[in-house]
Amino acid sequence: TLKPGKLVVKRPQTPVAPFPYKEENISFTNAGYTFNGTLTLPQNYSKTTPVVLMVTGSGQQNRDEELFDHKPFAVIADALARQGIASLRYDDRGWNDKNIDFYQFTTNDFLQDAASALPLLRKRFNKVGILGHSEGGTIAMMLAAEGKADFIVSLAGMAISGKETLVMQNRQAISSLGLPKEMVDSYCNNISNILDEIANGKKTSEITIDGVPDNLKPILKRSLEQANSPYIRHFITIDAGKQLSKIKCPVLALNGTKDTQVDCAANTTILETGLSNCKHTIKKIDGVNHLFQHCSTGSVVEYQQIEETIAPEVLETITKWINEL
């Protein structure tokens, strides 16, 4: 008899043992949570070996930032180690605890989690950097603004405000439905006004959505339900762009031209004007999405279908830049 088989997906970049480097299990604590992670150590590492703390994007993820069987952080850690760079990646707070409502936490909580890993790295290494993807990139910028990093790598990090990001994401989603521009504009204006009301402390149950076409009201209601969480309420108020001038350490910022979640043009513009007091390299990576995969449209739907986990030129850019510091 034939049994239903597990769908086998090809992920050719996922590292396979034996590795030409060492891995150690590491743990640290913050706010009552224990964080388990993997410290990847290149051959012949020493105190002068650069080390990178890796911070995941939004939503609860494991140390590999695993999504659709892609393991971007495992791929990056492998590439770094093969070029003589150490790294620490860790499972997000409450990983594997099914009773945790992850939306009760805020970006500031995740920033404190990341900061808590830095002392143990400083004990062992002289040069400690932070590499963050998406929300993790924003956290890297914020920690750098506090003087806590010797260098940072932002991969699709958000430099525009949280509110602007949410409005842009909504615009992208609604535009993809093929609706007329006036309707999209009207919807986005409504979202923008609603987010302002939420930022000013209004409960979502007190907000009216009169000016929205009937066919879009269910979508807006769903967005409103999410906006009631502490996570979104805090996210709206984030504006890393205002802190960029405080960053004194070297910055590498990469954004994909087909990113539909963190807009490439808007964010690189803010980075170019805001990073006024540090050595920085800002690159638009052509033809890649939010995960830095080569893609057709950049839509989230494609992430699973693409075999590539992360564009090789991105890995090369990161390792080369760190080694030239």
Pin down the residues of each PLM region.
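Short beta-strand element of the alpha/beta-hydrolase
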Residues: 48-58
